[in-house]
Amino acid sequence: DPEWSHLSLVYDILMHIVLSVRIESAIRKHYISGTFITHLIALFDSPDPQEREYLKMVTHRIYGKLTNRRAAIRRAINQTFYTFLYETRHHRGISVLLEILASIINGFTLPIRPEHRQSLEKSLIPLHKMAQYEEYSVQLSYCMALYVEKDRSLSAPIVRGLLRYWPTGNSTKEILFLNE
């Protein structure tokens, strides 16, 4: 892709800004705003898998370095899931966003906060109903397992969700559900 050399340069500069110890934290916080995060997460719908991988790396670094932007990242990811579920029904980066979310879930402290539980129930569990489920089933299953590992009581809403979205008549998807 001829554009990739330019895009990779932009992402390298952004990564440098995020990681640099020479740039004051206040400046980073000012420019990497909630709106910036929303636009960054929207880029995960890129048709280029290489760009999505770069975005994943940048998002991980922002999440780790700018703790005050963590909630904005989680909100933007959830909003992307909502848009995918209830509006567009198409998104190229759901599996990559689930990979990011898995590392975020892994860092959750106990007890699980109500906002994280709501994310599970309102955006993650409904992802099972989508026709594209097979494209991201491994990553979604891993997120479900991490939630249960953190709090066993969350297995009940997950099982109820699987039963609610059971893919009757789609044997391939049924097998994926059983494996989960």
Model feature map: region roles:
Residues R28-T38, R70-N78, I94-L97, I112-L124, ...:
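Core helices of alpha-solenoid repeat scaffolds
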Residues V159-R164, E180:
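Short, flexible active-site loops
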Residues S25-D48, K56-I62, T80-F84:
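Asp-box/WD-like beta-propeller blade repeats and closely related beta-sheet repeat scaffolds
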Residues K56-Q118:
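Internal metal/ion-chelating core segments
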Residues H6, H16, H30, H39, ...:
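Histidine (H) residue identity feature
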Residues D1-S5, H39-E51, N68, T83-R92, ...:
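Short coil/turn segments at helix-helix junctions and helix-capping linkers
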Residues D1-A42:
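Eukaryotic helix-linker segments that join adjacent hydrophobic helices
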Residues H6-V18, E53-H60, H91-N106, E134-V148, ...:
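Amphipathic alpha-helical elements of HEAT/ARM-like alpha-solenoid repeat scaffolds that form extended
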